[in-house]
A protein has these predicted regions:
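N-terminal secretory signal peptides that target proteins for export/translocation
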Residues: 1-5
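Noncatalytic, solvent-exposed loop/strand surfaces
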Residues: 20-445
């Protein structure tokens, strides 16, 4: 049920008079870098502020809500047996659950939900598949963690646990489906890598314990353009499309290795190996390079930067900190689960801490404990010169960008017993935040 209070007050930062387009059409936005641009979406609010609306979402899911053609879309997994995800301490950090997933006994509806941005009312709900998964997931994860994406006339969804990709119109009518099979994952944590849409190409990553495939599909019918294979190994990091000195490349991070492929042909252009752990967070890039942070829950891992324009095997010799191809590398720097953001030459990583680096040199500018007494799992957003991240308890932490640390603002979402692992999304004048139970809208939808 959607709840709309009579009075709504918030403190919004007016960043520019130029409005951005309303669409936020794939994971981390159209540019895949979490930059909202000029917006009057609220970045903080006073204690006790009510949302514009709150809508309970059936089932469970950590997919980011997207906004396309004046509608909100998200995915969810619905079963007769309640299966709300647990937080970090009740899930990932609980040793009794590691590698011991609770296998579902009831069929699950893998569904898409469309909501009205003004009221939060559910407009329609459509199941693209119904099945009992043959692979497990961790107590912290869901069977609907992959974020959908949208073009001007088509919505694309992916449920990695069963391997189904579906295309539908904005009324929920299915255009085509493709099935690639289930994905067994490391420690039975479950899946998480989202689709990537670039023009008429749809990229599907299937890095799991049985296979290592990256596929490029035609958006018109789901047929496969190319497949790039590598050794098996689970990755939860969503690929990015990077303009590498005029060539559009798909950069995919998997177990111990990052590889850049030509988007048109699927041919490998470069690879960086020697990265010892798996990937939970995705990459960021600019014209100067691509910035890599490996991450596993509870472990520290290397971060590094690959210079633009490189070809071949870029793997550093053991103990090396840089090369002609690698701008810099740091060991045991702990990227965390949220994907980083890049703002005016500065690289920000979030997790248990907030860490800022100079993107060109790797110099650490500051490292501070994450406010709110817990970590963040969802990715941050960049709104003007503000960086916003939601920790798992629902505290919205807003940091002003810059090499000098300034104590962040903290805004609370009153959500007793709910967890927040999904990445928030922005509309022109509103912020969308998903919890384990509901979707919240703050601002003026």
């Amino acid at each position: 049920m959607a709840i709309r209070p009579n009075l709504f007050a918030f403190v919004a930062l007016m960043l520019s008079s130029q409005a951005i387009g309303a669409d936020w059409a794939q994971f981390r936005g159209g540019n895949q870098m979490s930059h909202v641009g000029a917006s009057s979406a609220p970045v903080s609010w006073e204690k006790g502020t009510a949302p514009a609306w709150r809508t309970e979402i059936p089932g469970s899911g950590w997919s980011q809500p997207i906004v396309a053609q004046g509608k909100i879309f998200l995915t969810t997994a619905i079963s007769e047996t309640p299966d709300k995800p647990k937080g970090m301490m009740g899930g990932v950090m609980d040793p009794s659950t590691m590698g011991k997933p609770a296998m579902p006994k009831d069929p699950i509806q893998f569904a898409v939900i469309c909501l009205d941005p003004k009221t939060g009312a559910i407009v329609w709900q459509k199941a693209v598949a119904e099945a009992i998964p043959t692979t497990g997931k961790h107590a912290s994860n869901t069977y609907a963690t992959e974020t959908p994406c949208a073009s001007s006339d088509t919505l694309y969804t992916y449920f990695g646990a069963i391997g189904r990709v579906a295309a539908m119109d904005f009324e929920g009518n299915i255009k085509w489906t493709q099935d690639f099979g289930p994905q067994p994952t490391n420690n039975q944590f479950g899946t998480g890598a989202s689709l990537v849409l670039f023009e008429d190409a749809l990229v599907v990553q299937r890095y799991n314990e049985q296979e290592g495939k990256l596929l490029c599909l035609n958006t018109t019918d789901g047929s496969t353009r190319w497949t790039a294979e590598r050794s098996p190994g689970t990755s939860w990091a969503t690929p990015i499309v990077w303009n590498n000195q005029g060539q559009q490349q798909v950069v995919a991070a998997g177990q111990g290795m990052v590889v850049g492929y030509d988007l048109k042909s699927g041919e490998e252009q470069w690879r960086l190996g020697g990265l010892d752990t798996s990937f939970s967070c995705s990459l960021v890039a600019d014209e100067g390079g691509v910035y890599i942070g490996t991450s596993s829950p509870g472990s520290s891992a290397p971060i590094c930067a690959v210079r633009a324009g490189q070809k071949g095997d870029l793997t550093l010799p053991k103990g090396a900190k840089s090369s002609d191809s690698v701008l810099w590398a740091k060991t045991k720097s702990g990227a965390g689960m949220p994907s980083p953001v890049l703002v005016q030459g500065l690289l920000y990583y979030f997790g248990n801490t907030i860490t800022c680096y100079d993107a060109k040199t790797g110099e650490e500018k500051f490292r501070k404990r994450m406010p709110g007494g817990t970590l963040a799992a969802g990715c941050p957003l960049v709104i003007g010169d503000q960086i916003l991240v939601v920790n798992e308890r629902g505290t919205v932490v807003t940091l002003r960008s810059g090499g000098e640390y300034v104590d962040p603002q903290e805004s609370e979402i009153a959500a007793e017993g709910e967890f927040f692992w999904a990445t928030p999304a922005a509309m022109d004048h509103a912020l969308l935040v998903r919890s384990s139970a509901a979707l919240y809208c703050f601002g003026t939808p």
